[in-house]
Amino acid sequence: MTANDERRKSIDFSEPYAKTGLAILAAKDAPVQSVTDLQAPGRKVVVRLGTTGESWARQNLPKAEIKALDLDTSCVMEVVNGNVDAWVYDQISIMNYQSKHPEKTRALLAPLREESWAVGLRQGDEAKKSLVNETLARMRKDGSFARLADQFMAKERDMMKQQGLPFVFELP
């Protein structure tokens, strides 16, 4: 889950296990090449309700018409059907949905904002937090994250590298 200040009010987080960013799934024919284009008056942007993409869009796209929906698939179909210019969501999801609809969409993966994913934990449970952090550190050190990426996310890793972007498990 994305670790952010709003969520920190009610839960604690482990150390990050991944870094990602918000990206754009644009309709193939929409006049959108970057975030600057989304800031133009009259742009239609869909977001998933309750996500960091929604909060980012509401803060950064004051001239856009923002539509919040409950499901990823509903957001994708708004783009595919040409009802909106773009969807703001995480890079990995944007890549996956674009690959399912290449004839109707484009993925703009340069991050609008970088985010960290971490394990959410009950506030104050330092023992569990320490255990989770130790496990994550061990997985980084022994190559577990790299093996998981090879097995389950090779396409996404390669696509990000082709665009000169760091892969989500490549933490500094």
Identify the residue ranges that each predicted region occupies.
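A bilobed periplasmic-binding-protein/Venus flytrap-type ligand-binding module shared by bacterial periplasmic
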Residues: 23-32, 116-135
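A ligand-binding cleft/hinge motif common to bilobed small-molecule-binding domains
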Residues: 1-10, 55-56, 80-113
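Ligand-binding clefts/hinges and TM-proximal coupling segments of bilobed small-molecule sensing domains
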Residues: 52-67, 136-172
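Short beta-strand->loop
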Residues: 12-18, 65-67, 99, 103-113, ...
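Hydrophobic residues within well-ordered alpha-helices
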Residues: 38, 78-80, 119, 132
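Acidic, polar ligand-binding/catalytic clefts
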Residues: 1-39, 105-106, 110-112
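Short amphipathic alpha-helical coupling segments at ligand-binding clamshell hinges
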Residues: 90, 124-138, 144-148
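Bilobed "Venus flytrap"/periplasmic-binding protein-like clamshell domains
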Residues: 19-77, 91-95
